[in-house]
Amino acid sequence: MSGRGKQGGKARAKAKSRSSRAGLQFPVGRVHRLLRKGNYAERVGAGAPVYLAAVLEYLTAEILELAGNAARDNKKTRIIPRHLQLAIRNDEELNKLLGKVTIAQGGVLPNIQAVLLPKKTDSHKAKSK
């Protein structure tokens, strides 16, 4: 026998994605490819795409959590751009991060300046006179 073939060799382990190794939903491999193709640097370390994917996943989860709360407050089961807008603009840190971002179909925050509100008069004094 010449020793060819796979009779005695170890079976190769099932391939495991870098996303699953890191416990992430966002694609680490795709982020790595985009970092390489984007001409951000000549070389990209192995940890950089994992870290960036984790940050993106966290920010997405945070925004979706707040948008889901906004949708529930409006008695809706589907998140629409309006809910994203309300979630981002009502959160101080997200509003600072995404301050220059325009969300299509997002609308504006409801805001009436105090000067424009009707003056509060004492209705009890007016009725007694």
Curated annotation (Swiss-Prot):
GO terms for molecular function: DNA binding; protein heterodimerization activity; structural constituent of chromatin. Residues 1-22 are annotated as: Disordered. Signal peptide: none annotated. The modification N6-(2-hydroxyisobutyryl)lysine is found at residues 6, 10, 37, 75-76, 96, 119. The keyword Cytoplasm does not apply. Residues 7-19 have a biased composition (Basic residues). The modification N5-methylglutamine is found at residue 105. Monoubiquitination of Lys-120 (H2AK119Ub) gives a specific tag for epigenetic transcriptional repression. Following DNA double-strand breaks (DSBs), it is ubiquitinated through 'Lys-63' linkage of ubiquitin moieties, leading to the recruitment of repair proteins to sites of DNA damage. H2AK119Ub and ionizing radiation-induced 'Lys-63'-linked ubiquitination are distinct events. InterPro entries: Histone-fold, Histone_H2A, Histone_H2A/H2B/H3, Histone_H2A_C, Histone_H2A_CS. The modification N6-lactoyllysine is found at residue 10. It comes from the Eukaryota. The keyword Endoplasmic reticulum does not apply. The modification N6-glutaryllysine is found at residues 96, 100, 119-120. The modification N6-succinyllysine is found at residues 10, 96. Keywords: Acetylation, Chromosome, DNA-binding, Hydroxylation, Isopeptide bond, Methylation, Nucleosome core, Nucleus, Phosphoprotein, Ubl conjugation. There is a cross-link at residues 14, 16, 120 (Glycyl lysine isopeptide (Lys-Gly) (interchain with G-Cter in ubiquitin)). It holds the Pfam family Histone. The nucleosome is a histone octamer containing two molecules each of H2A, H2B, H3 and H4 assembled in one H3-H4 heterotetramer and two H2A-H2B heterodimers. The octamer wraps approximately 147 bp of DNA. Belongs to the histone H2A family. Core component of nucleosome. Nucleosomes wrap and compact DNA into chromatin, limiting DNA accessibility to the cellular machineries which require DNA as a template. Histones thereby play a central role in transcription regulation, DNA repair, DNA replication and chromosomal stability. DNA accessibility is regulated via a complex set of post-translational modifications of histones, also called histone code, and nucleosome remodeling. This is Histone H2A. It comes from Cairina moschata.
